[in-house]
Amino acid sequence: MTTTLKRPTDGEGSVQVHQDPSVNIEEETLVIAVYGKGGIGKSTTSSNLSAAFSKLGKRVLQIGCDPKHDSTFTLTHKMVPTVIDILEEVDFHSEELRPEDFVFSGFNGVQCVESGGPPAGTGCGGYVTGQTVKLLKEHHLLEDTDVVIFDVLGDVVCGGFAAPLQHANYCLIVTANDFDSIFAMNRIVQAIQAKAKNYKVRLGGVVANRSADTDQIDKFNERTGLRTMAHFKDVDAIRRSRLKKCTIFEMDDDDEAVQAVREEYLRLAQNMLDNVEPLEATSLKDREIFDLLGFD
């Protein structure tokens, strides 16, 4: 169960969604939460990273935490029903569900779940995420999983959508080399700073996406203590893979650009498995970002 607590210690003056300890994910599992500005390519990054982990022989579970429920369609090649949709069909009697009702097998055996969310303007997405993890534990679906990836809605870092941070070992932030994306990244760093006081989550690093250059990201990283873990340029093959509803690992093997992107995802996955050193980054004030970024 999830409850709302007043003024907890993990965010000054904030109201956060606090998870029941019984829904914690096993310690030996690598849990990654992927955040970033809305539309920056988090789902593409998450799905290709899941595919890369599977290529390295890992058992992978990807959990989409967006009411749009489009996180996993390149893995499953279709839009799958959400946990909320399935629970509504059984009047929220979760004991009536079977794993195959809400977990779908995707590319190379990656297990896919879409938590969904409440209707617009109602409810709490964090509650839905918590209930999804609880349901997975009830069916013992996390016991044989090596890697769990949470693909989280936009750059929303309220108590609800910060809920995946309570399960994660690392947070990866997807950004482009522009002001708006980096501004959103700074807000996410602030959320990690708050959650890290009471939870195990730490910053893993930055994924530069859809960017030929990284000069602005590099400025921000140097100032805050972040690092770039992977760099994906604006490669047309990535866009085409979304249109084909597949991962980059299912695209043309003879395309050199495809091969380069695959290698970068495999390198990122291996680095995360090698117990990447967590970062102690410090967020900037809004005015400091305005002064920092841009051309001299």
From Swiss-Prot:
Coiled-coil residue windows: none
Instruction: Report residues binding ATP.
Output: G39, I40, G41, K42, S43, T44, K68, N209, R210
The gene it comes from is chlL
The reactions it catalyses are:
chlorophyllide a + oxidized 2[4Fe-4S]-[ferredoxin] + 2 ADP + 2 phosphate = protochlorophyllide a + reduced 2[4Fe-4S]-[ferredoxin] + 2 ATP + 2 H2O
User: Mind listing the GO biological process terms from this record?
Assistant: light-independent chlorophyll biosynthetic process; photosynthesis, dark reaction
What's the top EC group for this one? oxidoreductase
> Protein name, please?
Light-independent protochlorophyllide reductase iron-sulfur ATP-binding protein
Pfam family for this entry, one:
Fer4_NifH
Record text on subunit structure and interactions: Homodimer. Protochlorophyllide reductase is composed of three subunits; ChlL, ChlN and ChlB.
What does the record give as cofactor? [4Fe-4S] cluster
Pathway membership? Porphyrin-containing compound metabolism; chlorophyll biosynthesis (light-independent)
Cofactor binding notes: Binds 1 [4Fe-4S] cluster per dimer.
Q: Which UniProt keywords apply?
A: 4Fe-4S, ATP-binding, Chlorophyll biosynthesis, Iron, Iron-sulfur, Magnesium, Metal-binding, Nucleotide-binding, Oxidoreductase, Photosynthesis
Q: Which family does it belong to?
A: Belongs to the NifH/BchL/ChlL family.
Please name the source species. Answer: Synechococcus sp. (strain WH7803)
